[in-house]
Structures are given as structure tokens and as C-alpha cells.
Amino acid sequence: MEVILLDEIENFGQLGDKVKVKRGFARNFLLPKGKAVLATKKNMAYFDERRSELESKAAKAIEEAKARARAINELASLTIASKAGSEGRLFGSIGTRDIAKSLSDAGIPVMKNEVRLLNGFLRTLGEHEVHFKIYNGVFAQLKVIIISED
């Protein structure tokens, strides 16, 4: 099934690309989320009319993502308090949701699906390196320090 991408899709293409995808991917993801339209003559003409509008919208989204990534990189570290045992292991763990909430509380809006924990959830006290994928091609990283609540 051929579709025209209305947004940049990782591993598929850029805005405006005409790509061939499997029917299920198009019907269940691309079309309902508004990330693509079927590649008909009518849709091709409609897309050509709206191309500049969509490109400016995409450029604006990239600029916003870069600004958020700069804000995360400029933040020296993020400290999170959690209950821990005497050996430095946490009761529970710190996950993507906890990190996103702490950053949002600090004034930098981050969604939990943008947080990348390379070694899984954080389960020990100390410093941990956390990576963020804000947008396709826009990355950031931050040092998260976990301290004991006691």
C-alpha cells in the first residue's frame, strides 16, 4: 500500500515522501494518527498545496525540540529522593515516568516516552547517565543523582 507521509517517520522517510508500507501498519498506525494519507491523485494534489504549511509546522516542532534538548543539557543534574536500604539499593526503582515527572516539576516538559534508560530502571543510589530522544535526530543527556530519603 502506498502512502504519502505527513510527518517524519523513523526508518520510513521524511515529510512528503511517497512510501510503500504494509496494509496493517498503514491502517492501524499511520492513517489513524494522521501521519500519512493514501497516495491517490487527489491526495497528491492536496498535499502539494499544503506542503509549505506542513514543512513549516515540522520545522517549528524541530526548533521546539532543540530548545527543550538545550534546556535539558544545560541542567547540570537532577536529584531524586527515594527510599533505600542500607546497602544502597532502592525499595522499588526509578523509571521513565519518575524522571519525566521530576524534570517537568523542574520546569522542563518531558514525556516519559522521550526518556531512554539504557541499562533498565535505576535501582541503586548514586549518579546515573540518562539519555533523551526528544524528536527524530534531537537528543539530550542528563546526570540523575538518586539520594536516600532518610
UniProtKB/Swiss-Prot annotation:
Pfam families: Ribosomal_L9_C, Ribosomal_L9_N. Binds to the 23S rRNA. The lineage of its organism: Bacteria, Pseudomonadati, Pseudomonadota, Gammaproteobacteria, Enterobacterales. InterPro entries: Ribosomal_bL9 (IPR000244), Ribosomal_bL9/RNase_H1_N (IPR009027), Ribosomal_bL9_bac/chp (IPR020594), Ribosomal_bL9_C (IPR020069), Ribosomal_bL9_C_sf (IPR036791), Ribosomal_bL9_N (IPR020070), Ribosomal_bL9_N_sf (IPR036935). This is Large ribosomal subunit protein bL9. The keyword RNA-binding applies. One of its GO terms (molecular function) is structural constituent of ribosome. Belongs to the bacterial ribosomal protein bL9 family. The keyword Metal-binding does not apply. GO terms for biological process: translation. Keywords: Ribonucleoprotein, Ribosomal protein, RNA-binding, rRNA-binding. GO terms for cellular component: ribonucleoprotein complex; ribosome.
